[in-house]
């Protein structure tokens, strides 16, 4: 009887622990309603092969990471000739000659020998109906990114880190790639020391995406600006994309934070942009940006290229126009030792009608809240 009681108690503890494993909270903004793997029984990969298999199969899954999965040297290395468009100083990134990029785009750049890890160049495929979550602060993928592409939908990535993807090399790999996907929520993810983009949404439609509470850490030994500030931050380049960015910490970058173009509607709300040595926004043709309640601190140039349209709520009174389209007023942004961001185009705000819209808080509490809550381990 005693052993039976002990066993029953242990089983109850295990069952309670298993039941507690899952996604925390729910998506806000365009990806509202995403369920990922739903109530599927959690699986705990132990090897990189198991992780790849779980992420890429046809099953609805809740995949829990309890350690670092290091892909760095899992596919060997390639040695070849690249180029150095930004110089040959020790802090400068150099470029892999992917698809003859050096010859086609930087023909005057000096050639240079490159050696990079093959695993980083192409990320792990994530198929539909997946929740990928980290346990505490321990779930990480090193040396390889994630790809949500080719019609994948209903995916949640939460509370993990993606790091150390050929940081010296442009075209060495992206942390998280989306292209031709729908209903994707990426939340409390830390990305650091990446060769190319921390986030890239490709040229096909990426419908209903929410990027929330993420930490884009731009500190790196190598950068295209040769100053330790990573240039390739967030690139939103899809066709008919709907993207919510809320509560993210964009830190120590020098450009593309974000770059928005090609029929992308971005709601950028309550993010903290801090210590950006170059520029934050590029808004190319077809980029439509509503920016409200953000804080820009020590951002030299908030907006560099402006060929699309943006409404940045230049005054409290100006923000009243949003009530017609969002059902509430928009809130002003905050600035400290930063450039200006006072665009007042409202012609595209009607595109928000009928969609799931993230709430907005006053900018005054954003910096402290984002620093405390963004990234892995801060659920």
Curated annotation (Swiss-Prot):
UniProt cross-references to SUPFAM superfamilies, sorted A to Z: Pectin lyase-like
- Catalytic residues as annotated in Swiss-Prot or TrEMBL: 256
Sorted alphabetically, the Gene Ontology BP terms of this entry are: cell wall organization; pectin catabolic process
Q: What general EC class does the enzyme of this chain belong to?
A: lyase
Instruction: Show which residues constitute the signal peptide.
Output: 1-20
Reactions that this protein is recorded to catalyse = Eliminative cleavage of (1->4)-alpha-D-galacturonan methyl ester to give oligosaccharides with 4-deoxy-6-O-methyl-alpha-D-galact-4-enuronosyl groups at their non-reducing ends
UniProt lists the family membership as follows: Belongs to the polysaccharide lyase 1 family.
Q: What does this protein do?
A: Pectinolytic enzymes consist of four classes of enzymes: pectin lyase, polygalacturonase, pectin methylesterase and rhamnogalacturonase. Among pectinolytic enzymes, pectin lyase is the most important in depolymerization of pectin, since it cleaves internal glycosidic bonds of highly methylated pectins.
Task: Please give the name of this protein.
Answer: Probable pectin lyase A
What species was this sequence derived from?
Aspergillus niger (strain ATCC MYA-4892 / CBS 513.88 / FGSC A1513)
Q: Which gene encodes it?
A: pelA
